[in-house]
């Protein structure tokens, strides 16, 4: 019987799930909107909501707790500075999930998870490490 089992396994080990959601939460905080499968979005939502609540409360111990969950110091800084200030008057409900059709390859249901009142300029900003062109051309 499945009584009392509230989270989806998503066909992954516990370590893989934890790492995946840490990466997804960091990406969501960085870009303020990501596209993923619907079950992953539904599982990610409470994780991010709790992180934003930590950011709103502030304090060194809660910042360290957020770092241990997110594993990204830059996104924790954004969480505790920008997002905490933005949602200081909102009592929960910081994210929304919008269904986005089905994926072409396997027909998986897709969804967009984004922050309510998000900064539209944050999407696509600094999308990852980029190699220096000057170093490769100088050789």
UniProtKB/Swiss-Prot annotation:
CC terms in the record's Gene Ontology section: cytosolic large ribosomal subunit
Name of encoding gene = rplQ
Could you tell me what this protein is called?
Large ribosomal subunit protein bL17
Q: Which species does this protein come from?
A: Afipia carboxidovorans (strain ATCC 49405 / DSM 1227 / KCTC 32145 / OM5)
- Family indicated by similarity: Belongs to the bacterial ribosomal protein bL17 family.
What's an example Gene Ontology biological process for this entry?
Answer: translation
**Subunit structure comment from the entry:** Part of the 50S ribosomal subunit. Contacts protein L32.
GO MF terms listed in the record are: structural constituent of ribosome
- For this UniProt record, give its keywords in alphabetical order, as a comma-separated list: Ribonucleoprotein, Ribosomal protein
UniProt cross-references to InterPro entries, sorted A to Z: Ribosomal_bL17, Ribosomal_bL17_CS, Ribosomal_bL17_sf
């Amino acid at each position: 019987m499945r009584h009392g089992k509230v989270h989806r396994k998503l066909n992954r080990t516990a370590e893989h799930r934890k790492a995946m959601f840490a990466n997804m939460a960091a990406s969501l905080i960085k870009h303020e909107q990501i596209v993923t499968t619907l079950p992953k979005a539904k599982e990610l939502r409470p994780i991010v909501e709790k992180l934003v609540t930590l950011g709103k409360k502030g304090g060194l111990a809660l910042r360290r707790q957020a770092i241990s969950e997110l594993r990204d110091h830059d996104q924790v800084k954004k969480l505790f500075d920008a997002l905490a200030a933005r949602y200081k008057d909102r009592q929960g409900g910081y994210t929304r999930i919008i269904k986005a059709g089905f994926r072409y390859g396997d027909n998986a249901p897709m969804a967009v998870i984004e922050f309510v009142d998000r900064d539209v300029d944050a999407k696509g900003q600094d999308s990852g490490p980029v190699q220096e062109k000057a170093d490769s051309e100088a050789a």
